[in-house]
Amino acid sequence: MKKLLSLVLSFALVCTLISGCGPKGGGGNSSNQPLDAAETTFGLTPLPERTTLTIGFFSGSAHSMPWYIADRMGFFDELNIDVEYESFIGGPAMMEASASWDICDVGAPGILNGMKNYDIQMLGLCDNEYNTALFVRPDSPQAADPTNPEIWKGIECILPTGTTLQYMFLSYLQSLGLSADDVTITNMDVTPALTAFNAGEGDALCVWNAVAYNAEDSGLVRITDVSELGINNVCGLAATKDAMENKSDLIDLAWMVYYLTWDWCQQSEDNMAQAVELYVESCEDEGVVSNESICQRALDILSLIHISEPTR
């Protein structure tokens, strides 16, 4: 537990220092001729030749949506970029498969794992994943008396290990004077974890993003989350060493489009409505249960920086 907590806190410190200083298709340019910078949505200069960007895509996550929105709105197409996706529902698997993508968005443990073991290079921050949450059943002892450490001892909690969900759960246990030794943790990705929990497995459940809102809407009780705990749960953009060395122009455009797309989403109610609609579409494509309400709530709390914001 101490090792995981210290790793995440170390990552948070790095991020503070940084701050201080298959294809989905989309609209856009129907011509084979590259546009001039003045003709593109964000005033960026298109690549001279058609190039493919492969994204490590976090299924159902709000911090992956700028990629999908940019793709579907044609922002990549007009820059002579085709987009392909390698989809994941957890950071560890994404890092293990890093040879299959160029750029990704992922939580702190994934970034740390990637930097340590896979030569992944961090590019910037993209969220604090406030909706990383712990749930129990409404008729459980934990729902009735959530701050009583005695009733947490010996429980089984279902979550994907090596992720921000484990970090959040261990932080909550620590606040009760407990540790991982006092419980049983069953490793399972979030989508099957919710299904298993609803089928009666386990005593507690940790899930994030659209899956967390789905759990809440189905009647499960939210005990705590990253926002309530007040812990640093930063997520980041990262690229592979190969992409940084051999596709630097592509990676530069990719991260700029990512941040500029989030700015675009917030420029008008119509833009945000399109973003929500595309979020729902993405979840449907990825097999993540969602609806307009879930996706709107997830985007409402997305703590993604504006590219125009001054650093502090």
Residue ranges and their predicted role:
Residues E245-S308, R312:
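Secondary-structure end/capping motifs
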Residues A215:
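Short helix- or helix-capping micro-motifs
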Residues G27, G110, V211, A243, ...:
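Flexible, active-site-proximal loop/turn residues at the rims of small-molecule/cofactor binding pockets
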Residues M1-T52:
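Short, low-complexity disordered leader/linker segments with a strong preference
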Residues A133-F135, G236-A239, A243-M244:
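Short glycine- and hydrophobic/aromatic-rich loop-to-beta-strand nucleating segment
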Residues N32-S179, T184-N187, D203-N209, R222-V226, ...:
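Short, glycine-/small- and polar/acidic-enriched structural segments
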Residues G91-A97, P192-A196, V211-A212, A298:
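Short, hydrophobic alpha-helical packing/hinge segments within bilobed ligand-binding/sensory domains
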Residues N233-T240, W255-Y259:
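Active-site-proximal catalytic alpha-helix in oxidoreductases
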